[in-house]
Regions:
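N-terminal secretory signal peptides that target proteins for export/translocation
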Residues: 1-7
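Bacterial N-terminal signal peptides
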Residues: 10-20
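Accessory terminal helices/loops
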Residues: 22, 120, 219-224, 232-294
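Boundary at the C-terminal end of the N-terminal hydrophobic targeting segment
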Residues: 23-29
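Conserved beta-strand hairpin/beta-sheet module of binuclear metal-dependent hydrolase folds
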Residues: 29-78, 175-178, 182-188
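Metallo-beta-lactamase
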Residues: 64-65, 120-243, 247-250
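Active-site metal-binding motif and surrounding structural segment of the metallo-beta-lactamase
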Residues: 67-113
Length: 294
């Protein structure tokens, strides 16, 4: 069988967990529509978002594994839109390891990110490949083409703006605000039904800045919020931001009371018994108790 783009879309599309987030009847009038690829636990439930206009589209992030990236390719192909831009929202590899696969199928799409995120990727890429490459095997990227730095803080899609916000503090942890459809793509700031990845927020100030960023999102009064990581079926609304902010507050309360990571893990598991992504809690507890370097 000849392996073509159409074949790829037909074979992989059933596995791409996409979610239309425009309300019933609104798709005919909304200037932009959204589809979400939600990866499984092996890829930390990371999300990629396809933002579509009438003819063109912007992709927010590319997935972690090659398999994730191929499923995202299928989602784009099935949309029948012209992919103009791939925006890398975060410096974590589960947001950008799929660049090489996406570029194979959409060579004309520009791959961009903010200057702070690019700087962080450049500083950590070699280590990330060293850590994850052997674990991922054939699912690891063959190459990782670097994105280019975005000029300004907006991406325009058919006249509608996608605004990059949260650049004031920890600018590599930004988020995307789409005012025309009152939607936030929260990146690593927002989790849905999962333990937060606190290993990258090792000081009280970093966590306070993170919490403030979540407060800024709430103030925008979004009608739709797409978390950077979420359990399947999680509501795509501001409750995910509230969940993340409450979790951070609880983490801050429990951390000084815990004598070690085991006690902190127990406290957070008790507070959030149904939360997924235990690896985030286990590593975050060890790092923030000084038992592990990250």
């Amino acid at each position: 069988m000849t392996f073509t783009a159409k074949t790829l879309a037909r074979l992989i599309a059933p596995f791409a967990l996409t979610l239309g987030v425009v309300a019933d009847g609104a798709a005919q009038t909304a200037p932009l529509t959204l589809q979400v690829y939600n990866a499984d636990v092996n890829s930390f439930h990371v999300n990629a978002v396809l933002v579509s206009g009438k003819t063109d589209a912007v992709l927010l992030d590319t997935g972690f594994t090659r398999a994730d990236a191929l499923r995202i390719v299928a989602m784009v192909l099935d949309s029948k839109k012209v992919l103009k831009t791939i925006y890398i929202s975060q410096s974590d590899p589960d947001y950008y390891f799929g660049i090489d696969v996406l570029k194979q199928y959409f060579p004309d799409a520009q791959v961009v990110t903010t200057a702070p995120t690019l700087k962080k990727i450049e500083a950590t890429l070699a280590t990330k490949l060293q850590v994850w490459g052997p674990r991922m095997g054939a699912n690891a990227p063959k190459t990782v083409p670097l994105p280019t730095a975005l000029e300004g803080n907006t991406i325009t899609l058919e006249g509608e703006k996608l605004e990059i916000k949260g650049l004031e503090s920890q600018p590599h942890r930004s988020y995307v605000w789409i005012p025309s459809i009152k939607t936030i793509a929260g990146g690593v700031n927002v989790y849905g039904g999962l333990h937060l990845w606190t290993a990258d927020a090792q000081t009280a100030q970093e966590r306070a800045d993170w919490s403030k960023k979540l407060g800024d999102m709430i103030a925008l009064q979004p009608t739709c919020v797409i978390a950077g990581h979420s359990l399947p079926g999680t509501k795509q609304d501001v409750s995910q931001v509230q969940w993340s902010r409450a979790y951070l507050a609880r983490f801050e309360t429990e951390l000084p009371k815990a004598a070690n990571s085991a006690e902190l893990i127990t406290a957070l598991k008790t507070a959030y018994p149904d939360a997924g992504l235990m690896i985030a809690l286990e590593i975050g507890a060890k790092v923030n108790n000084g038992e592990m370097k990250w």
